[in-house]
Design a protein with these regions (language model features):
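Patatin-like phospholipase
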Residues: 1-55, 63-290
Length: 290
């Protein structure tokens, strides 16, 4: 009887504990810094987190971290993202993807580059992983949970990294949208027909989202230096010039949205609620990766 009471009390205490969240920022090849941090943690078997939120390259880094594949993300960044097949500006002139995410993620099916989704699902357990994506229709951030099924997980990662103009209209996620999206469930049926783009457009630093989901200690791995500020004025000027030339105003609208969302999150981190601790991890020097 005493043993049962003790177990019950322990369970209640565990439920009452505030969540610890890990957020991995995007940043393309700059994600190699995040990969290094997570690899160091894997060496120490360090994983105290309850909630994971990844944006763009950050979602790939978190997946390999949960898969316990030390060195995996670094190999992909060095091997695939620098391959001439991955980025070809000339493909855009032929109406094709400038950044070939299809080729990139097909490569992750090969034996020597395979993501261990089974281990990732097992190590995640009852915890929560959210992969951010931006709806091309309403331009809102969606926070999507992989089911553990390999193809679905891979498509979520692709959508989270699909930059407009570079990867055309985006990724269609039907039939994988469900009530786990952060937006109202009444919107899900409509969103079944939508395309999804890079999560960094609407949720570049989803710190506020982690807080709203109950995290009271939030660790953020950044891919820019501590003094970085979004240059929204510069993007506004670029948009004016590009619109006058008739060049991709929609893409620039996305960039402006990204800058504003970034500034909003920086402001939240600079002026956080009194009941949250936010820890940011930066590189000592500015990263020169693309």
């Amino acid at each position: 009887m005493n043993s049962l009471n003790s177990a019950t009390a322990s369970s209640v205490t565990k439920i009452a504990q505030p969540k610890v969240a890990l957020i991995a920022e995007g940043g393309g090849q700059r994600g190699i810094f995040t990969a290094g941090v997570l690899d160091a943690w894997l060496e120490q078997n360090y994983d105290p987190f309850d909630l994971f939120i990844g944006t763009s390259a950050g979602s790939q880094n978190l997946t390999s971290y949960l898969a316990r594949q030390k060195g995996y993300a670094k190999r992909l960044i060095r091997g695939l993202s620098r391959n001439k097949r991955f980025f070809q500006l000339g493909r855009g002139l032929m109406g094709k993807h400038i950044v070939d995410l299809d080729w990139y993620f097909d490569k992750t099916k090969e034996v020597n580059r395979a993501i261990d989704f089974k281990t990732a699902k097992t190590s995640l357990g009852e915890r929560e992983l959210l992969i951010t994506a931006t709806n091309a229709r309403d331009r809102k951030a969606y926070y999507l949970s992989p089911t553990g099924e390999e193809h679905q997980w891979r498509e979520l990662l692709k959508a989270s990294s699909a930059l407009p103009f570079l990867y055309k209209q985006g990724v269609k996620l039907t039939p994988w949208l469900n009530a786990q999206a952060a937006n109202e469930t009444t919107q899900i049926n409509k969103a079944q027909e939508d395309f999804f783009l890079d999560g960094g457009l609407a949720a570049p630093l989803p710190v506020r989202e982690a807080y709203n989901r109950g995290a009271r200690k939030i660790v953020v791995i950044r891919t820019v230096d501590a003094d970085f500020q979004a240059q929204s004025a510069w993007v506004q000027k670029l948009r004016t010039l590009a619109t006058a030339a008739g060049y991709c105003p929609k893409t620039l609208d996305y960039l402006i949205q990204h800058e504003q969302a970034y500034l909003d999150e920086l402001n939240f981190m600079a002026n956080p609620p009194s009941d949250v601790e936010i820890i940011q991890i930066f590189a000592d020097e500015t990263l020169h990766s693309k």
